[in-house]
Amino acid sequence: MNRQSVLRLARQTGAFPLAELPPPYLAPSLHFSMNRSTVQCSNFSSTAAVAAGRGDLNKVRGVSAIHRTGPKYKLGVSKYPLPKPVSPDALPKRNATPDHGLWGFFPTDRTALSTPTYDIECGRSWSIQELREKSWDDLHSLWWVCVKERNRIATSDMERKRLKAGYGEWESSERDRVIRVTQNGIKHVLRERWYAWEEAQRLYRKGYRPQEDSQEAIWEMRADSVSNSQGAGQLLVVSKAEDMIDPLRHDRWEKGQEENSGGETEDGNAPSN
């Protein structure tokens, strides 16, 4: 018995009670027909009824790069002329720039792969004592020279691996090691200068002034020279007391002399009233 006959018989007899129906997994149509609502419904649509006749206004609807779906309409290229292949011999030759900056990343013979003889002729690295005597600009220039040279070595190493040359690895690594020692020395010198600058700032905040310290050092040096001269049996003739005093402290010394004299004149007598 088909579905229509079962439904017709159910209408005539007033439908089957649920107890007489087979299980839903055996006859799902019988259960669906009895539980179905009579409310009218329509498919979901977000488009207004008045816009149904205008068609789709989205020109790129359905175009997906993931699913590799092309455009909805065929596109022509007749508007733009297609390029025609040109033989390399017919192309104009370009003159190379002899002083281009990128030549600095290649050896002097301007080849991509440097020879072991060229790599081993690198000399020694800069010592820390030599770098301490250099200025900031010199250290800055030397650092970037090292960076450019290491870039050139890396280019030669990549070309050597690509060609599978089988030689020059030790010479290249040795030259790179010498350059890295120089760079570490530059970092060490700059670190020393940074610590010295921090120490100078700390002393200045505590009230230390290097000018006063230098004047005291000059005074001690003069005192040592006087004691050494007297110890050697030499007579040191000093015409004035000002000769033993630092010029920067001359005013202070004169003020002290006036206070000690108690208002006496140059001849040592008291002033007349």
Curated annotation (Swiss-Prot):
Entry's localization field: Mitochondrion
Entry keywords, A to Z: Mitochondrion, Ribonucleoprotein, Ribosomal protein, Transit peptide
PANTHER family the UniProt entry points to: LARGE RIBOSOMAL SUBUNIT PROTEIN UL29M, RIBOSOMAL PROTEIN L47, MITOCHONDRIAL-RELATED
Name of the protein in its database record: Large ribosomal subunit protein uL29m
Sequence ranges of Basic and acidic residues compositional bias: 247-258
Family stated for the protein in its record: Belongs to the universal ribosomal protein uL29 family.
GO cellular component labels: mitochondrial large ribosomal subunit
Organism: Aspergillus niger (strain ATCC MYA-4892 / CBS 513.88 / FGSC A1513)
Lineage of source species: Eukaryota, Fungi, Dikarya, Ascomycota, Pezizomycotina
UniProt-recorded Gene Ontology molecular function terms: structural constituent of ribosome
